[in-house]
């Protein structure tokens, strides 16, 4: 009988294919996305259309803010009170479980609002403390996340246009759950072969979910499995939520392919598209018929009205009331478990996750399961469908089983959630009306009492209504639609739900132009419609499973007594496996260490770059030494080779150093690994030497204690090594005739007993304090106390004697200097090789308190080498040579002889070969004042401040004279107190004639008296209040740098404005993006700094457009823009950009962390082009953001590039390795490439970098092209001259049209050293000269190799010299020297080169009577020794010869000499002044310029200029050299500018 029924059904299904659709596609194919179903309202029912309300929205603000606590009950409290109850209550209508899940399937075909909206908004559900499921520990802070659904962005604007949610699927019964809601989705499901849907390895199953399908792949809450693996490709995005929905999806999948196969057999000439569309049309029609005419009546217990035809004016859109009503009513009928049975009515046992056996599938453990062990074959799916058809559903009431109430799949970090509470929140999100308003809107009788909602429930279980009423404060008008509709249900949906559902389905049918019963759409004929009406879900099941129809009841949505295969019993939670508990995921779990390492690595970029720069600098320095031949070892005697190796212990906190110990006749020599002498210990009798050996710790320590020396402590590797030295030492001591004692101590006691070098230094410091307290009458308390640790140390301090080395070190000289030897021999009266306290005191008294006669007698005795009471000319020459040693000056013997002869001749002793003391003292008669100031310069002893000030003035413009009065008073310039000094200590500032010293060196007569150096008026000006001084200093600072301040203010105002604009936008104006809700501080900081960085890195290019700057500085713009400060501005911008880059990176570190802990639903809103919310929730790990995204990877690379560029561009490394700076700074090309890529990805906002970058980049490229057109022209070198001190003078051709000004600089590249490495040098030629010249000092590897290359050629002619590339000229601030009536040029070190051109240019212009505004130039040359720049001396000599109008005043300062008036400096000063007076030239430089010893005190000099040039209101000061010097000049200018007098405008450049 069953077999006959199956054959009959097959005939019926096959008959419509042969009778009907015989032609290819001849009808209007229905779109997959639902558009154009209604030809007047095209969007009705389409995917993404609004939900259509039946009742006006109910929001807290009338627009979009949902109602919630405290106005409405807590959702969890409400679900516990109204929906909790026991499971196992059978349906009163005997509805089957298959009908319940078919309803879910229909619902998924009609509506989907689960997709979260953007920006992410949350209505989190607060869990009451102590909740047994979600808060068993009673923490009280558990919150179940609930994200609001996607809404129409055009809604939610006003109360008349409240927020409306959008439908993510089509709002038609068009099989979108089978075929998808878009054409692309459908294409991904199709096989494009035979009109079938694509299947996997098993034809009964579709292919697995894979791109481009974006199936919802939420994690399995029971097992934690994630990913798309094991999920099937369905038309419904959430078709894999549980095996029961999967089974229905598989049913329709197989039914479609079955229809396509039969059509293919009937019409073999049809193609894939024809077969697919015919099969789809028939499946949809069957689906519509079953849903509306079979399932809906079983659900509502009432049939819809008869179909009256298509109504184009009826809006079929899904209502939010229908969504909540149907979904929530289905949830009350879901049982805790689902049976499986076969065709012979055998109910199977199922395998659980833990491999246990149970009678049914537990619903709570089946959500989002992958590769379910009970559903691996088509027969398993059939068994599940048959089991659902035979199983009675739960009762249709208010009770929801725990599988849905407590263990529904959770979202975000929670694996479980409360489905009912979620639906309540969804209703509030939808703005659903109250229960009473909904009834009134649908025309239902009003309810006024809680008991009237459900009289049966009120009688049987009144506590539910009472608890619900209590939660709503007994206010029935506040009762929400969802709980009210459930509470009125009993066996069937209540009147409210029934009305809502029936209304929706009638509108869906009557408003659908493609409804299968609509004969006007041309889809089906009357006969085909009749056949479809006669097809039921039972027929579909029989056709797909190929089973005997008798195994199924006629209506599979009900099971009545007598139907086949009754269920064993109504399932309850008993006997079923327990639900897997709720868990909370930590998205950042396992990432903390790696994240920290990554951030640490990024922070180490500067350190790595610093280490690399240090290595490069060391290598360059080493190579440089090799080039200079300075890397060879110290030249030592042969006898030093082969000493004993040991480690010298220097103290408890000092590191040990490896040494070699050499025993030599009469001394012990300690050297380092390079054979440089570290220490020499003299062995002279009758010294008592103590040799102490350690007796523990391997017996490897040795202490050699020698009187009047600090101890020598040596450590050896082995005792045998120590023993060898001990034996040799004993022999050496015996040979020297010294007594020695030897004993052992523990190593700790040995080191405690040892006197270290540091302890000896403290002892000597106290020695000197008490020594000078005897001479200078210092209070003993201020002199310090002797150590009182032990009587032995007190005795050592009192008997302390200085060795020759300590004596030399105290004077700051070398022990082998002739001055030290002479002085030490004179002071060492007992000849024991040491100076005692009394011996040092005797000679110190003469220096500190002696008369000029006593001092000159002392000097006479020092240099009377043969002790005959006479100084010969040879001894006088040796004395003079000892003075000159300290300046490293090597005058020839002839020059020294000339000096001595001139001094003898000046004093009338030209006929004498030897001098008595009286003759010697008479020779020094003109320098009595210098001798009065002569002291012994000892480190740590300062000269009184007043004397120092007067002495500084003595070196400048004044010529001091001795005060005639026996006692005068001097007023300190910084105070109002007067200090009295004796005539021997003070030079009188009153009788002063400043101009004489300036004019005299030029041999010109002084014609007028110049103002005094310090006047009373000046003193009053200086003694004004500190507030006035500060105000005046600020005023002058503003006046000096007004252009700089203006430009910097404008630039940083723009930068700050850009930062604030972006920061404000993301703080207050980017709510629609939602990113500030996720990372507020991080995004504000990163985007604000990004805007500023984009502006800075773009416009920093303009500061390097040298050609443009050189051109613009000649225009009127130079009055407003300080173009000469372009390089400083470049550094300022770069430094600020680096700081902002660090802040930008810090902001993104915060962003990455927050993105790494934000769920995918949030990230998909923030980055829709990067992420798709597929329900997996887990975000990408931190390393994905850093290294697998374009902005992240380019950002990391940018940090590395910037770290390299910044470190190598620092002043220190640029000075040590210019090539490293040159090469690394060319990474700017990579920098801008990465910046463009980094900013063009548009991860957060649209690219904006090009807005700032385009214009500066074009200007910069144009400027570079101009330089390129110049720098590739080969320039011939006319002359190359190797000057002393490593200076190379290059003279080369002047290119045609090459115009420049004095003080400008160029860049050159030597073709022999590479055509890409350019180095900047200042032109030392004057603009009027026909050739260009440079003076290049060999200060680095490149300049050293340049010097080697331009060594004198073997042949003749300049063709032998390598050619140059030239780029320039470029301007600097020194060009403005001619704009001041009086200019001061201060050059230090290599910084003097810009002034060579200026001096020559000035003299030339004055010689040709050219009108020059500048009337006077003071040139101050500061150098360690004049030998460093002999070439500049030649230029100065040329200037002096051509300076006929006395325009230039030159002062040379040699800083290597001591600044204090000690004996040797005094004698050197006397000889220098004598040489200058006799020959009108300096002893050191050979120039008429005044040579000073020490550093220039700029402040007194500038004060004197105010007196010398009182009519000049503004003096220009131009300094170039080391930063320390330029800072001192700047400080002096600031101090002078505090006074309301002459204004000093300072311009500087550091080298």
Curated annotation (Swiss-Prot):
It catalyses: NADH + O2 + H(+) = H2O2 + NAD(+); NADPH + O2 + H(+) = H2O2 + NADP(+). The keyword Cell membrane applies. It is a multi-pass membrane protein. Residues 1270-1376 form the FAD-binding FR-type domain. InterPro entries: DUOX_peroxidase, EF-hand-dom_pair, EF_Hand_1_Ca_BS, EF_hand_dom, FAD-bd_8, FAD-bd_FR_type, Fe3_Rdtase_TM_dom, Fe_red_NAD-bd_6. It is found in: Apical cell membrane. Pathway: Hormone biosynthesis; thyroid hormone biosynthesis. Residues 1087-1269 form the Ferric oxidoreductase domain. Peroxidase activity is inhibited by aminobenzohydrazide. The NADPH oxidase activity is calcium-dependent. It comes from the Eukaryota. GO terms for molecular function: calcium ion binding; heme binding; NAD(P)H oxidase H2O2-forming activity; NADH oxidase H202-forming activity; NADP binding; NADPH oxidase H202-forming activity; peroxidase activity; superoxide-generating NAD(P)H oxidase activity. The keyword rRNA-binding does not apply. Glycans are attached at residues 94, 342, 354, 461, 534. Generates hydrogen peroxide which is required for the activity of thyroid peroxidase/TPO and lactoperoxidase/LPO. Plays a role in thyroid hormones synthesis and lactoperoxidase-mediated antimicrobial defense at the surface of mucosa. May have its own peroxidase activity through its N-terminal peroxidase-like domain. Interacts with TPO and CYBA. Interacts with TXNDC11. This is Dual oxidase 1. It comes from Canis lupus familiaris (Dog). The gene is DUOX1.
């Amino acid at each position: 009988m069953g077999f006959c029924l199956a054959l009959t059904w097959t005939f019926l299904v096959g008959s419509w294919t042969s009778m009907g659709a015989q032609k290819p596609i001849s009808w209007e194919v229905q779109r997959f996305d639902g558009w154009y179903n209604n030809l007047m309202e095209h969007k009705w029912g389409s995917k993404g259309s609004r939900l259509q309300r039946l009742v006006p929205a109910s929001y807290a603000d009338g627009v979009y803010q949902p109602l919630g606590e405290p106005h409405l009950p807590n959702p969890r409290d409400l679900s516990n009170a109204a929906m909790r109850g026991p499971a196992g209550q059978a349906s009163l209508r005997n509805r089957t479980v298959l009908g319940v899940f078919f309803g879910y399937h229909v619902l998924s075909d009609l509506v989907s609002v689960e997709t979260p909206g953007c920006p992410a908004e949350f209505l989190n559900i607060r869990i009451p403390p102590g909740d047994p499921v979600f808060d068993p520990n009673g923490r009280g802070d558990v919150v179940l996340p609930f994200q609001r659904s996607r809404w129409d962005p055009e809604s939610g604007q006003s109360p008349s246009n409240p927020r409306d949610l959008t439908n993510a699927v089509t709002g038609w019964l068009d099989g979108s759950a089978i075929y998808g809601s878009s054409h692309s989705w459908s294409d991904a499901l199709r096989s494009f072969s035979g009109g079938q849907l694509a299947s996997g390895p098993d034809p009964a199953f579709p292919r697995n979910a894979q791109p481009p399908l974006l199936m919802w792949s939420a994690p399995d809450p029971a097992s934690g499995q994630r990913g798309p693996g094991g999920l099937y490709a369905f038309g419904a995005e959430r078709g894999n939520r549980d095996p029961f929905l999967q089974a229905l999806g598989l049913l329709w999948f197989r039914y479609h392919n079955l229809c396509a196969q039969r059509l293919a057999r009937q019409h073999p000439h049809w193609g894939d598209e024809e077969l697919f569309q015919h099969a789809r049309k028939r499946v949809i029609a069957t689906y519509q018929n079953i849903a509306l005419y079979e399932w809906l009546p079983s659900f509502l217990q009432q049939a819809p009205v008869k179909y009256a035809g298509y109504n184009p004016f009826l809006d079929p859109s899904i209502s939010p009331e229908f969504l909540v009503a149907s979904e929530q009513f289905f949830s009350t009928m879901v049982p805790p478990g689902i049976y499986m049975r076969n065709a012979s009515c055998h109910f199977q046992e199922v395998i659980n996750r833990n491999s246990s056996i149970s009678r049914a599938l537990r619903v709570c453990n089946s959500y989002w399961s992958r590769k379910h062990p009970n559903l691996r074959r088509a027969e398993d799916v059939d068994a599940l469908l048959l089991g659902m058809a035979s199983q009675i559903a739960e009762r249709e009431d208010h009770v929801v089983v725990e599988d849905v109430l407590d263990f529904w799949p959770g979202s975000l970090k929670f694996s479980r959630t409360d489905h009912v509470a979620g639906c309540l929140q969804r209703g509030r999100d939808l703005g659903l009306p109250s229960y009473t308003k909904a009834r009134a809107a649908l025309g239902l009788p009003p309810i006024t009492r809680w008991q009237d909602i459900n009289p049966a429930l009120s009688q049987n279980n009144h506590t539910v209504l009472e608890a619900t009423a209590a939660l709503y404060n007994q206010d029935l008008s506040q009762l929400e639609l969802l709980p009210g509709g459930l509470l009125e249900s009993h066996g069937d949906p209540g009147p409210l739900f029934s009305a809502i559902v029936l209304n929706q389905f009638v509108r869906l049918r009557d408003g659908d132009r493609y409804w299968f019963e609509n004969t006007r759409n041309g889809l089906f004929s009357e006969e085909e419609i009749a056949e479809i009406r006669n097809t039921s879900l039972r027929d579909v099941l029989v056709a797909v499973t190929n089973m005997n129809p008798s195994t199924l009841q006629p209506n599979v949505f009900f099971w009545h007594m007598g139907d086949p295969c009754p269920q064993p019993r109504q399932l309850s939670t008993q006997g079923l496996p327990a639900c897997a508990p709720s868990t909370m995921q930590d998205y950042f779990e396992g990432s903390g260490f790696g994240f920290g390492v990554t951030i640490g690595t990024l922070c180490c970029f500067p350190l790595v770059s610093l280490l690399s720069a240090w290595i490069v600098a060391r290598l360059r320095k080493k190579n440089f030494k090799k080039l200079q031949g300075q890397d060879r070892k110290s030249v030592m005697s042969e006898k030093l080779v082969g000493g004993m190796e040991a480690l010298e212990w220097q103290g408890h906190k000092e590191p040990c150093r490896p040494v070699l110990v050499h025993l030599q006749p009469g001394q012990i020599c300690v050297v380092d690994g390079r054979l440089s002498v570290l220490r020499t210990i003299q062995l002279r009798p009758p010294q008592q030497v103590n040799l102490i050996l350690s007796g523990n710790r391997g017996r490897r320590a040795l202490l050699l204690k020698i009187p009047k020396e600090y101890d020598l402590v040596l450590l050896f590797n082995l005792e045998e090594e120590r023993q060898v030295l001990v034996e040799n030492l004993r022999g050496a001591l015996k040979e020297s005739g010294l007594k020695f004692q030897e004993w052992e101590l523990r190593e700790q006691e040995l080191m405690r007993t040892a006197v270290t070098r540091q302890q000896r230094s403290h002892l000597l410091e106290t020695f000197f304090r008490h020594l000078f307290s005897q001479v200078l009458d210092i209070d003993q308390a201020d002199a310090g106390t002797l150590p009182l640790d032990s009587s032995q140390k007190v005795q050592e301090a009192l008997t302390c004697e200085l060795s020759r080395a300590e004596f030399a070190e105290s004077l700051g000289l070398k022990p082998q200097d002739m001055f030290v030897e002479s002085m030490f021999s004179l002071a060492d009266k007992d000849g024991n090789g040491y100076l005692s306290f009394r011996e040092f005191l005797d000679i110190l008294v003469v220096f500190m308190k002696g008369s000029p006669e006593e001092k000159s007698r002392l000097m006479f005795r020092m240099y009377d080498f043969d002790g005959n009471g006479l100084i010969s000319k040879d001894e006088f020459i040796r004395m003079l040579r000892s003075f000159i040693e300290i300046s490293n000056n090597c005058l020839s013997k002839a020059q020294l002889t000339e000096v001595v002869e001139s001094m003898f001749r000046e004093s009338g002793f030209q006929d004498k070969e030897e001098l008595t003391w009286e003759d010697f003292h008479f020779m020094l008669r003109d320098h009595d004042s210098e001798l009065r100031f002569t002291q012994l310069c000892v480190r740590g002893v300062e000269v009184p401040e007043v004397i120092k000030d007067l002495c500084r003035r003595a070196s400048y413009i004044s010529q001091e004279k001795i005060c005639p009065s026996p006692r005068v008073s001097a007023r300190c310039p910084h105070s109002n107190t007067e200090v009295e000094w004796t005539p021997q200590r003070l030079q009188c500032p009153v009788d002063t004639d400043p101009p004489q010293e300036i004019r005299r060196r030029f041999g010109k007569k002084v014609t007028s008296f110049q103002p005094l150096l310090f006047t009373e008026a000046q003193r009053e000006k200086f003694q004004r209040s500190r507030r006035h001084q500060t105000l005046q200093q600020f005023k002058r600072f503003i006046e000096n740098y007004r252009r700089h301040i203006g430009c910097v203010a404008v630039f940083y105002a723009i930068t700050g404005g850009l930062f604030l604009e972006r920061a404000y936008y993301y703080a207050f104006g980017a709510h629609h993006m939602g990113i500030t809700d996720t990372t507020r501080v991080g995004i504000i900081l990163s985007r604000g700094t990004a805007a500023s960085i984009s502006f800075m890195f773009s416009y920093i290019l303009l500061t390097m457009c040298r050609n443009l700057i050189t051109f613009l500085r000649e225009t009127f713009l130079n009055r407003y823009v300080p173009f000469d400060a372009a390089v400083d501005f470049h550094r300022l911008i770069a430094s600020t950009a680096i700081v902002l880059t660090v802040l930008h990176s810090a902001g993104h570190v915060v962003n990455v962390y927050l993105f790494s802990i934000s769920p995918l639903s949030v990230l998909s809103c923030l980055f829709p082009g990067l992420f798709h919310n597929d329900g997996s929730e887990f975000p990408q790990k931190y390393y994905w953001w850093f290294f697998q995204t374009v902005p992240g990877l380019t950002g990391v690379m940018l940090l590395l590039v910037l770290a390299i560029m910044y470190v190598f561009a620092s002043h220190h490394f640029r000075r040590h390795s210019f090539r490293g700076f040159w090469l690394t700074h060319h990474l700017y090309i990579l920098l801008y490439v990465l910046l463009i890529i980094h900013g063009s990805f548009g991860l957060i906002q649209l690219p904006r970098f090009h807005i700032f970058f385009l214009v500066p980049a074009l200007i910069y490229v144009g400027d570079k092209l101009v330089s390129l057109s110049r720098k590739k022209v080969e320039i011939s070198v006319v002359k190359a001259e190797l000057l002393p001190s490593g200076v190379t003078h290059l003279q080369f051709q002047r290119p045609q049209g090459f115009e420049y000004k004095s003080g400008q600089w160029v860049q050159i590249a030597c073709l022999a050293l590479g055509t890409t490495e350019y180095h900047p040098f200042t032109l030392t030629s004057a603009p009027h000269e026909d050739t260009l010249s440079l003076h290049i000092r060999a200060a680095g590897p490149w300049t050293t190799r340049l010097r080697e290359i331009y060594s004198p050629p073997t042949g003749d002619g300049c063709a032998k010299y390598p050619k140059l590339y030239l780029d320039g000229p470029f301007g600097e601030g020194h060009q403005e020297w001619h704009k001041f009536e009086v200019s001061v040029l201060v050059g230090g070190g290599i910084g003097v080169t810009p002034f060579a051109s200026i001096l020559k240019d000035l003299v030339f212009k004055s010689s040709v009577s050219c009108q020059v505004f500048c009337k006077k130039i003071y040139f101050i040359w500061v150098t360690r020794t004049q030998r460093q720049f002999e070439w500049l001396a030649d230029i100065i000599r040329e200037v002096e010869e051509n300076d006929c109008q006395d325009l230039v005043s030159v002062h040379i300062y040699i800083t290597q000499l001591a600044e204090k008036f000690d004996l040797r400096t005094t004698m050197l000063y006397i000889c220098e002044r004598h040489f200058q007076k006799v020959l009108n030239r300096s002893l050191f430089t050979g120039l008429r310029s005044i040579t000073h010893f020490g550093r220039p005190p700029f402040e007194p000099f500038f004060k004197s200029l105010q007196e010398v040039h009182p009519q000049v209101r503004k003096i220009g000061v131009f300094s170039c050299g080391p930063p320390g010097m330029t800072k001192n000049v700047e400080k002096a200018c600031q101090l002078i500018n505090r006074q309301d007098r002459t204004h000093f405008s300072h311009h500087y450049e550091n080298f």
